[in-house]
């Protein structure tokens, strides 16, 4: 059991030499030299830099990093993936997503305007998790300083450009589909009936 020492039971330091000895004892303990040895050892190791030269070098981020949002396109056709369901707007906890839709000529929803207020966004990732088409994802861009508090990202800024479409990669973070997804999908009944008709 630990016995606590009352302050007045301690040995009283009387002379200045005793104070100096107490100072040396408290300063030069073993922990100080252990810490100095760790710092010196890490400093003298080659190719063991813990810092990067920021403007020239960029940090490699995880696929799960939640940076500035991106609106992806379909790789085959280049059309927008967003179907205008509005789930991202409904689930947004900071109420920063705005979407305007209209019915197109084919009777499907078309997204007219899509904006995100990055000043209000808390980058929780709920919008990307709830998206049924994986149209909105978080990118790896973390350099988005702005002079205004309300900094909006609009559809034309978030959507993948046509000339960059060949470089667009499928989202590999949380909620993405596995690479062998085609092997895991079961055939629909219409495919089965077509196969039966072909065999007859």
UniProtKB/Swiss-Prot annotation:
It catalyses: a quinone + NADH + 5 H(+)(in) = a quinol + NAD(+) + 4 H(+)(out). GO terms for biological process: aerobic respiration. [4Fe-4S] cluster 1 binds at residues 82, 85, 88, 131. It holds the Pfam family Fer4_7. InterPro entries: 4Fe4S_Fe-S-bd, 4Fe4S_Fe_S_CS, NADH_quinone_OxRdtase_chainI. It is a peripheral membrane protein. Residues 73-102, 112-141 form the 4Fe-4S ferredoxin-type domain. NDH-1 is composed of 14 different subunits. Subunits NuoA, H, J, K, L, M, N constitute the membrane sector of the complex. This is NADH-quinone oxidoreductase subunit I. It comes from Campylobacter hominis (strain ATCC BAA-381 / DSM 21671 / CCUG 45161 / LMG 19568 / NCTC 13146 / CH001A).
């Amino acid at each position: 059991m630990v016995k606590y020492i009352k302050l007045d039971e301690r040995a009283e330091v009387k002379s200045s030499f005793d104070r100096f000895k107490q100072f040396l004892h408290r300063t030069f303990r073993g922990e100080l030299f252990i810490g100095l040895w760790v710092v010196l050892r890490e400093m003298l190791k080659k190719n063991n830099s813990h810092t990067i030269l920021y403007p020239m070098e960029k940090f490699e981020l995880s696929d799960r990093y939640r940076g500035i949002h991106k609106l992806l396109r379909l790789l085959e056709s280049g059309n927008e993936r967003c179907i205008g369901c509005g789930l991202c707007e409904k689930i947004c906890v900071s109420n920063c997503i705005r979407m305007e839709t209209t019915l197109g000529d084919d009777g499907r929803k078309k997204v007219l305007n899509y904006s995100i207020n990055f000043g209000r966004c808390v980058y929780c990732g709920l919008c990307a998790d709830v998206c049924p088409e994986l149209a909105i994802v978080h990118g790896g861009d973390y350099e988005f300083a702005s002079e205004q508090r309300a900094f909006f990202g609009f559809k034309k800024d978030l959507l993948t450009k046509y000339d960059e479409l060949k470089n667009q990669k499928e989202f590999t973070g949380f909620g993405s589909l596995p690479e062998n997804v085609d092997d895991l999908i079961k055939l629909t009944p219409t495919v089965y009936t077509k196969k039966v008709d072909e065999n007859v």
